[in-house]
Amino acid sequence: MIGSTVRQQAVSSIVDGKGPVRSDMNGVPADKLFGTNVFGPAEMKAHLPKDVYRSLKRTIERGATLDPAIADVVASAMKDWAVSRGATHYAHVFYPLTGLTAEKHDSFLVPDGEGGALTEFSGKALIQGEPDASSFPSGGIRATFEARGYTAWDVTSPAYILDGNTLCIPTAFVSWTGEALDKKTPLLRSMQALNVQAQRVLKLFGHENPDRIVSYAGAEQEYFLVDRKFYYARPDLLAAGRTLFGAKPPKGQEFEDHYFGAIPERVLAYMVDMEQELFKLGIPVKTRHNEVAPGQFEVAPVFESANIASDHQQLVMLTMRKVAERHGFVCLLHEKPFAGINGSGKHVNFSFGNSTQGNLLEPGDTPHENAQFLVFCSAVIRAVSKFAPLLRASIASASNDHRLGANEAPPAIMSVFLGDQLADVFDQIRAGGAKSSKSRGTLEVGVDTLPKLPKDAGDRNRTSPFAFTGNKFEFRAVGGGQSISGPLIVLNTAIAESLDFIATRLEAAVQSGKPLNAAIQELLAQIIAEHGSVVFNGDGYSADWHAEAEKRGLPNLRTTVDALAALEQPEVIKLFDKYNVLTPRELHSRYEIYLEQYVKAIAVEQKIGTRIAKTMILPAALRYQRELAEGAAAVKNAGLTPDTKALEEVTRQIGELTSGIAALESAGAHEGGSTLDEARHCRDKVLPALEKVRAAA
């Protein structure tokens, strides 16, 4: 069999190959390496005049409008710094609706007219670029002949040097008509909306002119590493990102021995190399470890501003793939590359606050007495409850559908885990008023030489899609290969709407003469009474929870096609329009784009699945059938009665495979109708046909 030969060659090559590539920090301490390729605050201060630096810093920290007069000075300083570090080109980096990174490189070099050249970078080139807007997904916003689009410098996300020769400038990407064609623009708008509404609430608590409120994020990235020789032997992995065929291995993850196990030397060398590259880019990766499935690992950073965290997450995925090639690996970010073992998610840790008031989701030791925390926490609960379908839509994709709802990832039902302490506090509020908080206490292990451990007031719940974990919420349903900007846009905007609701109610109550504390207690009780059904502290994997969620009226949107319908709901359209995050046209364009991406992803799987089944699996099965038939004939010619059970079973299976291939080809030939019709056909016809072929193979 061809497949077996290729596999044997791959195994032999790996076994006979060199040992793991060793990597170190080249003798440079991590803190000295950190940010060396970033034009961050220290470099700005060193290269810019004081007044220009102060003006730029004010824009970055306070959200003030950028002064166009300083653009040329900043551009020149940025160019000089980049050239001194070996850069020859610059690029406006943006994040189109493909979910990937886009960039076009332009040289600093300009002919001087006398046979020589000089380097040049103007303020205009820094602030604005003009890529072709018709060649990216636009969902109808741009026609093929309407090509003009603009990139605009995002001053809040620092420029950096990538691969030693290109100055990369993070930018927003909009059409000639000003409509957002990317993931950064609505994220920045949503952060602005959250800030405005959070400021209103803080002022009610006596904070006059509080600093800008920023949402923070940190994404725990799971991934698989596969030797490149195995990867290129699998056309399905190459084209679809996941294996469409394959038997369950004799040993998978059932021994639970891979999670947090000793990191293999070759993998550790890769991790160290990857971290070194990320440190240079100013990305504060913190943890690394084995994940649950064989060949699966995780890297996680420290919290950053949501905008920078989103940019950095794109860089993390790019760097992971690049560095993997150096070590003979391929890095897989698909949510479910292998059936039968865990897939890869990206837990997004989320909070918001500022340097003055701190983390607004910090409960303190006595959360029942922390009215400010309870108000902001209740805003999050209300947001998840009211816009659960939208939150589910924000992480919808063909690949993530394979992961959600299995006993490895949270279900598609959006619920909130609060933990014992907070659940008890909110139960008290609903009953008439919170009087106490469960204490944290200490844990004695029973060994004299081991210290007493501070014990948290509640357990963790890994089955919850949206869990409170001490001073932040963790959104666990995000897929391993997805941009985190989509979920962050939804969280920022939905929470802004809840804070708007709360601020409006409290402002009116105070103006009418009601004491603030009494108004808060009354409003919190109302919010929990109306939205407490979204709180669930139990086992999200259990069938009982699915039945209970249905009783509570919580939506269970199992597929992307079901989930994306939320983007067309009037209340969602109104939400994004009211807070100037997405216009109705911009929102509808995303609905069309995400449906189209779903259709295209499954179409690729259908095509490569059909090809593999017809050209690799079926021929091998027919050869095996012939060998069995020839063996039976030889036994019969010897005057004996052959046992044909194996031949009959293989013949039956070949029949199932042949009919399955025909059904898969027929399903793939479907054309016509709207994008929604095509998506439904892919869900209802193509995917079942593909699974049938896999089972037969």
Positions of PLM-derived features:
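Gly-rich Lys/Arg/Thr-decorated short loops/hinges at beta-loop-alpha junctions or inter-strand turns
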Residues: 29-40, 59-61, 178, 250-259
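Flexible inter-domain linker/hinge segments
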Residues: 10-15, 24-44, 192, 196, ...
